[in-house]
Amino acid sequence: MKAPIPHLILLYATFTQSLKVVTKRGSADGCTDWSIDIKKYQVLVGEPVRIKCALFYGYIRTNYSLAQSAGLSLMWYKSSGPGDFEEPIAFDGSRMSKEEDSIWFRPTLLQDSGLYACVIRNSTYCMKVSISLTVGENDTGLCYNSKMKYFEKAELSKSKEISCRDIEDFLLPTREPEILWYKECRTKTWRPSIVFKRDTLLIREVREDDIGNYTCELKYGGFVVRRTTELTVTAPLTDKPPKLLYPMESKLTIQETQLGDSANLTCRAFFGYSGDVSPLIYWMKGEKFIEDLDENRVWESDIRILKEHLGEQEVSISLIVDSVEEGDLGNYSCYVENGNGRRHASVLLHKRELMYTVELAGGLGAILLLLVCLVTIYKCYKIEIMLFYRNHFGAEELDGDNKDYDAYLSYTKVDPDQWNQETGEEERFALEILPDMLEKHYGYKLFIPDRDLIPTGTYIEDVARCVDQSKRLIIVMTPNYVVRRGWSIFELETRLRNMLVTGEIKVILIECSELRGIMNYQEVEALKHTIKLLTVIKWHGPKCNKLNSKFWKRLQYEMPFKRIEPITHEQALDVSEQGPFGELQTVSAISMAAATSTALATAHPDLRSTFHNTYHSQMRQKHYYRSYEYDVPPTGTLPLTSIGNQHTYCNIPMTLINGQRPQTKSSREQNPDEAHTNSAILPLLPRETSISSVIW
């Protein structure tokens, strides 16, 4: 049924009236061109989409039905881009179809991207607008295209709704849509404060971990429609002005400089979240902005964002004076402001007087630091430094030039077959390792009582004389030494006690193990307090036997300085011939040899050979005994005389006592009386007949 002619005229008038309301943007061939519409369609490949002619949704006050009734026709054209050739669209009716004022794609393909122009016209009027369609693919491994996302912001601890955008064309009014939500393309167990309402996701209390990409998925026929929204969480909108961090508002900051130098004034401030408003921070000198100053040497840097979190920012701006002149000195103010207010703080650029306080303090600080470093090095490596100095620049001690021995070694003698597992290492160290190292490696001359002492009177007086002839007294505190009270000899003899108390001799006490709990240990502590010049050195077991250990360095440091010189063969033989008992040692050794030779002279030949080999092998195994060998002339006789039960006497030529060997004469030249003319009767003490003390 056709409409009455008056009605058509009225409709046409109304339509043309509406066309005149909108301002024209362009005109070509009498057709008004509104260029490209602000609404852009973005879909993923394979999704359906409906493109509506925008003329009926904002450009004219009518709809498609009225326009069609007024005799206007709707035409669609496609072009690749603005200004390109437009060609009419041939609709196939299946994948791409024209339905009233829209074009439907079911589904879209990549080649569907472009500009779609809808034109309504008749013989008198023409109007045109273009709509953009972009078809894209998902990013690799994701369910969305990062260039086709929607963006939303939410304030911390407040509520936020995220809508599934542009799905109105796929919803049925009589049916609730079935929409699935994903976060970062993964299904998620949502917390109770997140609820779903039709096509929206409601977060009742936004948290910082709600930041992310939310994707809604809707099924439409045999197709899937997805929309992705990126949610950004910010701090709550601030209602306070910015806060100045430096310089402070409450006081005037003074910055000193010298004329001709470069000056840099930095202002830092904190800005709360103010939406999309950029922070405003700037410098002024008096009432002038820096840009208004005539000097090009004074300028502002760009605003730098130092920190940013949830929209809150810490920013800074610098005022630079390239070469300070007298006119540049003065008061500069830093201003910060936002929609809630303004704050400012001042810096006084002041000329610095020539003072050397800082330089002097720096120099003194450097010297103090150097002294601290040197003291620390000296504390840690004192012994090594002193040993190095003594070895290269030191001189031997002069106080002990009249003394024959470097040290008197006091220890407890325990035979090796009596060593047990617990004290074996200590005894081996005291009897073997310690003397060997001091004599053979460091070249010290030790007085070892068990080896060097030849009693001439009372035993205690002999020990006192030997200690007096030594520069140091070394006491080796082994468990056996403590149990047997080996130091008692130094307390009994008055001369020895006075030497310890007055500091006449320096004592080196070597503790070989943990002595606490051992019987008589309290007396050891009392002895330490009695000795005036005492050094205690700990021996911590076999690890201290290494040559480079701290133990030997400390011991060498406490011993008298002695340059290590190569020991010749003759010196090695005569190492113990000096001192107050040198001659007696020689005589003792010779007398022992003589006694042994005489005893063997009357023995069976096989017994003599066996005893000779056994004796010398045992004497060489124990280094702390020194053997003296003398070849008795075959024809010589050494008569032995026994007086009582106390001593054994031996007739020895005086030439042997003086350390000389007789020159052998022929039997015709030799005087029969010479063999006994220069002879002497010397006693063989009980010690020379294998009886010796235990503690020395």
Swiss-Prot record:
Segments crossing the lipid bilayer: 358-378
GO cellular component, as recorded: axon; cell surface; cytoplasm; dendrite; glutamatergic synapse; plasma membrane; postsynaptic membrane
Active site as annotated: E491
Ranges of the Cytoplasmic topological domain: 379-696
Start-end of Basic and acidic residues biased regions: 666-676
Domains as described in the record: The TIR domain mediates NAD(+) hydrolase (NADase) activity. Self-association of TIR domains is required for NADase activity.
Sequence similarity: Belongs to the interleukin-1 receptor family.
Disorder cited: Intellectual developmental disorder, X-linked 21: A disorder characterized by significantly below average general intellectual functioning associated with impairments in adaptive behavior and manifested during the developmental period. Intellectual deficiency is the only primary symptom of non-syndromic X-linked forms, while syndromic intellectual disability presents with associated physical, neurological and/or psychiatric manifestations.
Function: May regulate secretion and presynaptic differentiation through inhibition of the activity of N-type voltage-gated calcium channel. May activate the MAP kinase JNK. Plays a role in neurite outgrowth. During dendritic spine formation can bidirectionally induce pre- and post-synaptic differentiation of neurons by trans-synaptically binding to PTPRD.
The protein's name: Interleukin-1 receptor accessory protein-like 1
Species the sequence originates in: Homo sapiens (Human)
